[in-house]
């Protein structure tokens, strides 16, 4: 492993604790600056070559996705505080600025314009595919590279040379999940319940394609609005199809509600899902007993999965007082990819930075990053089973 691929923990964990200052921002365009090790504040300062390297972090700090936004912010802050503690990029410190997208694509569009005006040279986030897709045209026009935590295949359809993913697409999550459910477990009667936003639409498409490749047609397939909280009518219809497996394609809170309501209706099908099922919000919403046995497809199956994951979890916990999960790990990896690119090109910007990101080869928590022309750098997930509230990897 090369020097830029190694994780730097130890004393840097104490520095990372300073990043926990972000508060929820209620107004579109509102932001807060991370206390960079350089001690500078949010505005433009000095020459671009001498001042801090300014990077925007865009994630929900309020609204239904705010928990993901906090995980993302902490993962990014940990990585940046580690590199700043080690001297920064060619002696320049990275300065983060946090923007609250509220999980709203309209707010995201406004923030994309603000980021360009604020002088940020790159963006990390968002966790919401729909928000990232809304921001992408403006970021492309302004030549601002963006490493997103979204996973919808719709991100690829944007065709922006400035847009990169810090994890696999939904197609990878769902292909792995479908193969395990159908081939390894032998289930044939599979129902689907997805929502109608960018993430859910992508999941519906990806899982349908993955099942079709295995000769499976869902016994039931229902779609609900992303803000619907009572899925009883759809689940009742699904129950009548007597499925062996219920695949869910929705964000964390809604997925948890689906599981809770399914069990209340006596629906005993095995639950199968991608990234959302690996989060604390899913588990707390569904209830530990209801979530037990859920099959999860994810590139990050917990903080004990590898020595690197254990070291990351120790540093994260020391800094923030709580354990990380997938989104924190993804954000950390995305920040490390950005840092690696900035080191190689000596703090370059625009298309040069985008090209440097594309050339990065990085051994991350989620796997080995190697970007293709579409902006995807990770192409595999693994299977885990939720047991007593903990994801246990399947050998």
Question: Where do the PLM segments sit?
Answer:
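Segments of small-molecule ligand-sensing domains
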Residues: 324-328, 339-391
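Extracytoplasmic "Venus flytrap"
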Residues: 42-75, 99-106, 127-130, 193-201, ...
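Beta-alpha junction/loop-to-helix N-cap segments that form part of ligand/metal-binding clefts
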Residues: 40-41, 67-72, 86-157, 224-228, ...
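Bacterial lipoprotein signal-peptidase II cleavage site
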Residues: 22-41
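Extracytoplasmic ligand/sensor domains, especially the bilobed periplasmic-binding protein
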Residues: 110, 117-220, 270-293
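Sec-dependent bacterial lipoprotein signal peptides
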Residues: 1-23
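Extracellular/periplasmic periplasmic-binding protein-like sensory domains
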Residues: 259-332, 386-393
């Amino acid at each position: 492993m090369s020097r830029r691929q190694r994780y730097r923990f130890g004393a840097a964990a104490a520095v990372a604790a300073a990043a926990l200052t972000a508060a929820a921002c209620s107004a579109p365009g509102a932001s807060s600056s991370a206390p960079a090790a350089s001690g500078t504040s949010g505005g433009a300062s000095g020459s671009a070559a001498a001042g801090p390297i300014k990077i925007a972090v865009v994630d929900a700090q309020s609204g239904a996705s705010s928990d993901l936004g906090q995980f993302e912010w902490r993962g990014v802050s940990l990585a940046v505080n580690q590199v700043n503690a080690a001297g920064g990029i060619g002696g320049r410190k990275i300065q983060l600025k946090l923007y609250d997208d509220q999980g709203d694509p309209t707010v995201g569009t406004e923030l994309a314009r603000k980021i360009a005006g604020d002088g940020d040279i790159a963006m990390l986030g968002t966790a919401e595919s729909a928000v990232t897709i809304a921001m992408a045209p403006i970021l492309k026009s302004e030549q601002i590279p963006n490493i997103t935590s979204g996973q919808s295949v719709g991100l690829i359809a944007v065709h922006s040379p400035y847009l990169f993913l810090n994890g696999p697409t939904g197609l990878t999550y769902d292909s792995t999940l479908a193969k395990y459910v159908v081939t390894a477990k032998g289930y044939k009667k599979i129902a689907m319940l997805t929502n109608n936003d960018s993430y859910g639409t992508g999941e519906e498409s990806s899982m349908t394609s993955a099942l079709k490749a295995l000769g499976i047609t869902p016994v039931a397939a229902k779609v609900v609005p992303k803000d619907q909280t009572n899925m009883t009518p759809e689940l009742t219809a699904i129950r009548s199809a007597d499925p062996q497996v219920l695949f869910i394609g929705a964000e964390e809170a809604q997925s948890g509600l689906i599981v809770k309501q399914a069990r209340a209706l006596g629906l005993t099908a095995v639950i199968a899902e991608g990234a959302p099922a690996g989060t604390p919000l899913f588990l707390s919403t569904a209830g530990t007993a209801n979530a037990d046995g859920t099959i999860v497809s994810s590139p990050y199956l917990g903080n004990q999965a590898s020595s690197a994951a254990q070291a990351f979890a120790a540093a994260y916990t020391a800094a923030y007082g709580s354990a990380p999960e997938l989104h924190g790990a993804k954000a950390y990896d995305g920040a490390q990819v950005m840092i690696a690119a900035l080191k190689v090109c000596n703090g370059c910007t625009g298309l040069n930075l985008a090209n440097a990101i594309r050339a990065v080869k990085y051994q991350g928590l989620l796997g080995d990053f190697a970007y293709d022309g579409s902006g995807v750098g990770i192409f595999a997930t693994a299977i885990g089973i939720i047991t007593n509230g903990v994801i246990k990897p399947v050998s």
